[in-house]
């Protein structure tokens, strides 16, 4: 059995434009996130738990986009835009696993900010490298476990004869739309998985930031308040982008499914968010900006010498 992707433009000129546009964005995503990872691993001033989480987030987003974007680029230039049942299940499994890990990791980063601002004296003792590694590994394993359960459930359902998917890749809503035995139970099962991956981490993030805001209001120094807020604002911006798109995609009922709207939101969190994350963290964080600048300078000097 094969699925056919129906969302690609039929005009040959648009194929080339789409390929060039997506290639450019993908190149910027890989470059930006690799710069973040390299800067964090080479700059001693960034050897803290906050930057360890940021480096892990960038690493996950490199893998996250690599699951779908190369396939999108290949399909853009191919006449037959198909994928096998196994290929679709594999793509969805990795995409959901890494996307869920991303959400769980953002919750861990919120906890890190909570400890740093609300318990600054205990921060070095509480947020050890061992704990950070455990939280990152737990995020990935939890995402993988949730993904395997969801994908096994979806692909155990019968699919209709016309396997046309109104999308660019195998995401949950468009694939569920071609399931023949759609029922309230199936929709609720997918919703439970979405709540575990999106709503629960978002609740933990909201709780962390409630305590953070309360702590910030107690800081009398304007400079101290501004510094604390600047370290949180980057993370909060990324959270709103990521969770806003994911909630719109996965927490809405299937009756409100709109293929065109769905595709646009998918492009935002598949290409837009991974592209903006390095920019947000680099531009809003002076330490990160300085580290990236030094890495680029060293690279330019080594090439010129």
From Swiss-Prot:
GO cellular component term, pick one: plasma membrane
Residues in compartment: Cytoplasmic: 38-45, 112-130, 209-228, 284-305
Chain ranges passing through the membrane: 17-37, 46-66, 91-111, 131-151, 189-208, 229-249, 263-283
Membrane topology according to the record: Multi-pass membrane protein
Domain of life assignment: Eukaryota
Alphabetized GO MF terms: G protein-coupled receptor activity; odorant binding; olfactory receptor activity
Function: Odorant receptor.
Similarity section: Belongs to the G-protein coupled receptor 1 family.
Name of this chain's protein: Olfactory receptor 10W1
Organism: Homo sapiens
Source taxonomy: Eukaryota, Metazoa, Chordata, Craniata, Vertebrata
Gene: OR10W1
